[in-house]
Design a protein with these regions (language model features):
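Short, well-ordered secondary-structure "scaffold" segments embedded in the functional core
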Residues: 1-185
């Protein structure tokens, strides 16, 4: 059933929270020089593709980016290009890779950890806040780990890139199936 109003979302998912993160997967090095540069991730020091996931408190995948992005792109750029639309009262938990999201999306209830300023240590309350934030956000990391347990998503992707999104959709569906059926027991 498709939920059409904010009230319906609140009825079916009381206290709904969203946890958003991106993940990279290594691919074979492209032959084309231009594509080589586009897919090279400076963070991983490899050629990669990125996929963004949004999960709920139980770890169920609610949204996956429709198309993979080139590994060179930053997490926040991936979010700006293709982001899930959530009701205004839903809390969205991000990591520091999405720093600045409050300025670009003022209606979004974005919750980010406190960023350390140069040469200034975080206070104890800020450190405690960051610890609580990471404890809540770890669910998205666990879900990504479940996805990567499937060999096709955890190892280097050796298939054609035009099939990547179909494969990640299939694996996401299997992970959701396993999560949903383990919750009901």
């Amino acid at each position: 059933r498709r939920l059409r109003t904010v009230e319906e979302v609140e009825i079916y998912f009381p206290g709904f929270q969203a946890f958003i993160d991106s993940t990279e997967q290594e691919i074979q090095r492209p032959k084309n020089k231009k594509r080589k540069k586009e897919y090279y991730s400076g963070k991983k020091k490899r050629h990669t593709v990125k996929t963004q996931y949004m999960v709920n408190k139980e770890g169920t995948i609610l949204h996956k980016s429709n198309q993979h992005k080139k590994g060179r792109q930053h997490d926040y750029t991936v979010y700006k290009d293709e982001h899930p639309i959530t009701p205004p009262q839903v809390k969205n938990y991000f990591d520091l890779g999405y720093y600045g999201i409050e300025n670009d999306f003022p209606d979004l209830k974005a919750i980010l950890p406190v960023k350390k300023k140069r040469n200034i240590e975080l206070t104890k309350t800020e450190k405690r806040y960051n610890k609580r934030h990471s404890r809540q956000r770890v669910i998205v990391e666990h879900t990504i780990c479940r996805i990567k347990k499937f060999g096709i998503m955890g190892n280097r992707y050796r298939n054609r890139l035009k099939r990547y999104d179909v494969m990640s959709d299939i694996v996401s569906g299997l992970v959701n199936y396993k999560i949903i059926h383990s919750i009901r027991r």
